[in-house]
Regions:
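Substrate-binding groove of N-acetylhexosamine-processing glycoside hydrolases
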Residues: 133, 142, 153, 185-203, ...
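N-terminal carbohydrate-binding accessory modules
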Residues: 12-37
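Disordered, acidic Ser/Thr/Pro-rich linker "stalks" and the adjacent N-terminal cap
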Residues: 415-488, 496-500
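Flexible loop residues that form catalytic
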Residues: 76, 209, 351, 374, ...
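Short, small-residue-biased leader/transition segments that mark boundaries at the very start
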Residues: 2-6
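Substrate-binding cleft of carbohydrate-active enzyme catalytic domains
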Residues: 38, 42-254
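Residues that line or immediately flank small-molecule/substrate-binding pockets and catalytic motifs
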Residues: 46, 75, 350, 436, ...
Length: 501
């Protein structure tokens, strides 16, 4: 109880500091306040780009000021292993280092790892003492640090350092652990044991996303495991791994947290789902009685462009302005009252494939994390974007004075010109016929057969569901029936080309 009072006083002080104006004046009044969600988080990907301890501490200071209380560290991925594990020294001697400083260069040039200390080796890792220092620093600001150790996928760096843990035992060939191999579980449990000794967090994040499972159908050990356990497909094989790791974590008084793919093949009994592919996975978890943390890419992925792409450094794509982050409501209106409490919180994520420097990372985080913090703290009825925007402009100036590198909100261009108002033309509402084998790709249907004549232009990203995609046949064949002979003065269309990294 005393600890809760101290924590609440800490948040009260943050509110007080935020209300003081430039003249050191404070408005007269009474503040009655409480957070909407228990979990208010930010994820930092330190694998694709390694950030040193001082940088992470600096972000903790800001996150605490805006009343976030969870820092999720994405410690492992193909681009580099970032935490010291005594039992497996090759993870930091080799898997923590790569040939190129930027993810894009590394990805496009063979994706090779390097020995620590070799020429041109880029990377790094946190020693155990570093982790203890970070955890204590965060705890003093009422932030819990949650570690993520990826499994069964996103593990190329591990499987190149220890290829015997893959299905084919070949370095540089596999991304998924061999779930049929007992040595895999020995490795994972040993790693998690050392991780739990460093992180007192309630949750241990195990990833669980984007498993290709390509080798599992032909791997003798995986097939033997499936037969022995009565598993009907590779999704259930992944679920077997998740269930088994959960039992291990629960045995150490910890809870399992994973991306929404952990639903595939059956959700582990006590798991919490972090829903990133929309909110559907989170809702599925909640309806089955599990907690969910909402972090859909559409609203919470800060690696997307936050302004007109041609005015910004290269990003992974998308368009996520401050206003859209602020508009996010993690609890759908359709959710029953008794289930609302299972929406445990929200989180923003900064994956760093296209984040080459600490300064760039801060530009992508701020001020969008302020919007996320308000989503996490304030009830929808208490929110007003116009008021928030004024406060965000002030916050940007304060952040700059404190040595941060936020996005210059005052220079924001906004959405693509014309995207927010309807276009009037002769083809609006007319019938569209697509040629044989030249229809749009179902995954990018936009408004379906009427999308091209609905009078609505696309914005900066195809993610706005206004752009119709043609990717299968690399061609399009469209007929628009104007119903009568019509004099035309202009024929045109907008096109967007999206290429891979």
């Amino acid at each position: 109880q005393r600890q809760m009072c101290i924590r609440d006083s800490f948040y009260g002080v943050q509110t007080f500091l935020q209300m003081v104006n430039e003249k050191k004046e404070l408005p007269v009044g009474t503040v009655t306040d409480e957070p909407r969600f228990a979990y208010r988080g930010m994820m930092l990907d330190v694998s694709r780009h390694f950030f040193d301890v001082n940088f992470v501490k600096k972000q903790i200071d800001a996150f605490a000021y805006y009343k976030l209380n969870r820092l999720h560290l994405h410690l492992t991925d193909a681009a580099g292993w970032r935490i010291e594990i005594d039992k497996y020294p090759r993870l930091t001697e080799f898997a923590a280092w790569r040939e190129f400083p930027t993810w894009k260069e590394w990805w496009n040039n063979g994706r090779q790892y390097s020995e620590e200390g070799s020429e041109n080796a880029y990377g790094g890792y946190y020693t155990k003492e570093d982790i203890r220092e970070l955890v204590a620093y965060a705890e003093s600001r009422y932030i819990t640090v949650i570690p993520e150790i990826e499994m069964p996928a996103h593990s190329e760096e591990v499987l190149t350092a220890y290829p015997e843990l893959s299905c084919t035992h070949e370095p540089y060939k596999q991304a998924d652990f061999c779930v049929g191999n007992e040595k895999t579980f020995e490795f994972l449990e040993n790693v998690l044991t050392e991780v739990m000794e460093l992180f007192p967090s309630e949750y241990i994040h195990i990833g669980g996303d984007e498993a290709g499972k390509a080798s599992w159908p032909t791997c003798k050990l995986c097939q033997a495991r499936m037969k022995k356990e009565g598993l009907k497909d590779v999704n259930e094989l992944q679920s077997y791994l998740i269930h088994r790791i959960e039992v291990f974590l629960n045995g150490h008084n910890r809870k399992l947290l994973g991306w929404d793919e952990i639903l595939e093949g059956g959700l582990a009994p006590n798991a919490t789902v972090m829903s990133w592919r929309g909110t559907e996975g989170g809702m599925k978890a909640v309806e089955s009685g599990h907690k969910a943390i909402m972090t859909p890419g559409e609203f919470c992925y800060f690696d997307s462009y936050q302004d007109a792409p041609d005015s910004q450094p290269e990003a992974i794509g998308g368009y996520l302005p401050l206003s859209k982050v602020y508009s996010f409501n993690p609890v759908p209106d359709t959710l029953s009252a008794e289930k609302v409490g299972l929406v445990y919180g929200v989180q923003a994520n900064l994956f760093t494939e296209y984040i080459p420097t600490p300064e760039h990372a801060e530009m992508m985080i701020y001020p969008r994390v302020l919007a996320l913090a308000e989503v996490a703290w304030s009830a929808p009825s208490k929110k007003n974007y116009e008021d928030f925007h004024v406060r965000a402009l002030k916050a940007v100036e304060e952040l700059k004075k404190s040595g941060y590198n936020p996005f210059e909100l005052k220079n924001e261009i906004g959405n693509r010109p014309g995207a927010d108002k309807p276009v009037e033309h002769l083809a609006v509402g007319k019938k569209v016929t697509y040629g044989l084998d030249a229809a749009y790709y179902p995954g990018y249907a936009a408004g379906g057969d009427t999308a091209l004549v609905d009078g609505v232009r696309g914005g900066w990203t195809y993610g706005d569901k206004r752009w119709q995609g043609f990717i299968d046949k690399k061609r399009m064949d469209i007929t628009i029936d104007l119903e009568k002979e019509t004099e035309l003065h202009f024929i045109g269309a907008d096109f967007m080309q999206v290429c891979g990294p």
